[in-house]
From Swiss-Prot:
This is Endonuclease V. GO terms for cellular component: cytoplasm. GO terms for molecular function: deoxyribonuclease V activity; magnesium ion binding; RNA endonuclease activity, producing 5'-phosphomonoesters; single-stranded RNA binding. It catalyses: Endonucleolytic cleavage at apurinic or apyrimidinic sites to products with a 5'-phosphate. Pfam families: Endonuclease_5. PANTHER family: ENDONUCLEASE V. Its cofactor is Mg(2+). It comes from Thermotoga sp. (strain RQ2). Belongs to the endonuclease V family.
Length: 225
């Protein structure tokens, strides 16, 4: 798959923040109408201190049948800094994206979208590169305030930055911690909440696209795939 080359990656943390502040102006928060035919999940892990591994799994929806899996392993040059993970993980994701033959209608990232100090988490940032609707689903809160949803599957509450709604906190599995859902690009809060609920099977905490991407990341790390 092709993508837009919006900036280089040889940046200092200060330069990276400036890039985020410029790119955030380009984000489009719009409803996603209908249902996707193909949905992709993205997971990244770090087998070594300077080595990263990106996996993209494309699923048919609503069967969740795996259509394609691509991966990319390579050197990581940007330091780990909360709020700047796209600069650490983005280059590997884009190299994996270039290998993809099946175009997904929606891409789900294990990370943040709008729920970010500068409104540009990895789901938003990479969404601008690939120009496909994206959603961030994180296991923990990076930014924003919320009231804990009740311990009931599919219960939820809004995530706020002041009075602005920047995402949702969704209890996908009873008895488990909620996930933090926010739109990336070409997506809005309500659509991202609706789709993440639809992508998460009963008894699971993590939506199938990123859950399966994580499974294959771990298999690749162990040399089992």
């Amino acid at each position: 798959m092709d993508y837009r080359k919006l900036h280089g990656w040889d940046l200092s943390p200060e330069e990276a923040i400036k890039v985020q502040n410029e790119l955030r102006k380009k984000i489009k928060l719009v409803p996603y109408e209908g249902e996707p035919e193909y949905v992709a999940g993205v997971d990244l892990s770090f087998p070594g201190k300077k080595e990263g591994l990106a996996v993209i799994v494309v699923l048919e929806y609503p069967s969740f049948r795996i259509v394609e899996i691509v991966s990319e392993r390579g050197e990581i040059t940007f330091p780990y800094i909360p709020g700047l993970l796209a600069f650490r993980e983005g280059p590997l994701f884009l190299k994996a994206w270039e290998k993809l033959r099946t175009k997904p209608d929606v891409v789900v990232f294990d990370g943040q979208g709008l729920a970010h100090p500068r409104k540009l988490g990895i789901a938003s940032h990479m969404g601008l590169f690939i120009e496909i609707p994206t959603i961030g689903v994180a296991k923990s809160r990076l930014y924003g305030t919320f009231k804990m949803p009740e311990d009931k599957r599919c219960s939820w509450s809004y995530l706020y930055d002041g009075e602005e709604i920047i995402g949702c906190v969704v209890r996908t599995k009873e008895g488990s911690a909620p996930v933090f859902v926010s739109p990336g690009h070409l997506m809005d809060v309500e659509s991202s909440k609706r789709l993440v609920k639809a992508f998460t099977l009963p008894g699971r905490r993590i939506p199938e696209p990123t859950r399966l991407a994580h499974i294959y990341t771990q298999r690749l790390k162990k040399g089992l795939f």
